[in-house]
A protein has these predicted regions:
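Gly/Thr-rich phosphate-binding beta-strand-loop-beta motif of the actin/hexokinase/Hsp70
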Residues: 1-19, 98
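Short glycine-rich, Thr/Ser-proximal phosphate-binding strand/loop in the N-terminal lobe
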Residues: 11-35
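Short alpha-helix plus adjacent loop in nuclease-associated cores
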Residues: 73-115, 266-275
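Short, basic/hydrophobic alpha-helical segments
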Residues: 32-49
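A short, charged helix-loop
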Residues: 100-128, 166-178
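Glycine-rich, often acidic, oxyanion-interacting loops/wings at catalytic, nucleic-acid
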Residues: 130-217
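Low-complexity, acidic/Ser/Thr- and charged residue-rich accessory regions of DNA metabolism proteins
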Residues: 265, 304-370
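Phosphate-backbone recognition surface of nucleic-acid-processing proteins
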Residues: 218-222, 228, 234-312
Length: 370
């Protein structure tokens, strides 16, 4: 058997090779191009095990050769630190540490590194779309803040709701005779409107790409507060609820479970774990009032806990409760028990009508009944 630890970069990767029944160690660096990849392929086979640390290009990289080897393990960065691979020095040393960990795990049969699930191409595409989604939202927010700041500096104390309302935008553009102020406001307004248009086009593509997961979307949107886009975001993060041991594992992966440290009789509650994905909880946290108001049980619980817990703690706990319910819905493949048939039907009818505009993203299976 051959054990390969790979330290991956954007333009090259360094491999450390260890062998069964041998202390021999070989290290080689390949370019991340056609020539380098073919040279790498010649060094691996069906008796080869590979360990790669998860980075931005890892999933696309391992897809190239996963069928050529016995197994590819993609390791979570935070999890690697917890099992004793800190203090990175050089590419060769990094690759060697990974290879040693891999060999120890395979030879002993004792799992030391929990692998990261390599998402299918469709999920990777959704995640890429949502990365752009978050970038555009941040840029829109920054642009609005700058316009608001300019107006306040010049004694125009309008609220953001007024400034960026459709009716007031023309007035805001012509609000001052000062050339430089007017120039900046109009420049930023042009930028804002361009970003908003791009954002709308992006949402359209997200909805189209998410249509592959219609059954899950139909289940998730049965919960008050979850839109089609939020449902697609949850799917992009979790892939499949069946890969999680239980609801606690599911909630932890979505960064809603705090880390707990204890010594003797002292227990410290720390921030939520970072060894997971944060897209879903970011969008879900924006709809907490809808979740609370649409669920009498949650509403009573929030009122009770809010009497003796800080608002931030209650907010995160509510997120955790919602995520736990989402897990049960996906696991059991059933609608939310407080779902509103009228609102849910309206959401799904609008989505299916949207998809009907492009037959590429719509099948007879999901057609709207007359």
């Amino acid at each position: 058997m051959k054990f390969v630890g790979i330290d991956l970069h954007t333009n090259r990767f360094t491999c450390c090779y260890l062998f069964d029944n041998s202390t021999e160690k070989q290290t080689e660096t390949f370019g991340l191009d056609t020539e380098g990849l073919f040279s790498f392929y010649s060094t691996i086979g069906k008796d080869t095990y590979v360990l790669v640390e998860a980075t931005i290009n890892t999933f696309a990289f391992v897809t190239l050769f996963k069928d050529l080897v016995a197994e590819v393990i993609v390791a979570n960065t935070y999890q690697l630190k917890s099992v004793g691979i800190p203090g990175k020095k050089t590419d060769k040393l990094d690759a060697a540490k990974l290879a040693e960990k891999l060999k120890a795990q395979i030879v002993s049969g004792v799992q030391q590194i929990v692998p990261v699930t390599v998402p299918p191409k469709e999920i990777r595409a959704l995640r890429a779309l949502f990365a752009t989604y978050r970038t555009l939202r941040k840029e829109i927010g920054r642009t609005k803040n700058r316009i608001h700041s300019l107006l306040k500096e010049n004694l125009y104390p309008f609220t953001k709701e007024y400034i960026f309302g459709k009716k007031a935008r023309k007035e805001i553009r012509n609000i001052s005779d000062d050339y430089l102020l007017s120039f900046q406001i109009n420049l930023l307004m042009d930028t804002l409107e361009h970003l908003e248009e791009a954002f709308e086009r992006l949402v359209v593509e997200i909805k189209k790409a998410g249509s592959l997961f219609m059954p899950q979307i139909e289940i998730l949107t049965s919960m008050t507060g979850i839109s089609v886009v939020t449902a697609i975001a949850v799917i992009a993060d979790v892939i499949d609820a069946g890969r999680f041991r239980n609801s606690k594992h599911f909630a932890s992966y979505l960064r809603s479970v705090p880390r707990v440290e204890s010594s003797n009789d002292k227990t410290i509650i720390k921030s939520t774990t970072k060894a997971g994905r944060k897209l879903a909880i970011t969008l879900l946290s924006q709809s907490l009032n809808h979740f609370r108001d649409g669920n009498g049980k949650l509403s009573r619980w929030v009122e009770k806990v809010g009497k003796y817990k800080k608002k931030g703690i209650v907010r995160m706990a509510l997120c955790r409760r919602v995520i736990t319910e989402i897990y049960q819905m996906l696991k059991k493949r059933e609608y939310h028990y407080f779902y509103n048939p009228v609102l849910h039907g309206k959401k799904m009818a609008e989505y299916k009508k949207f998809l009907q505009k492009d037959t590429k993203y719509f099948s007879k299976e999901f057609s709207i009944s007359a």
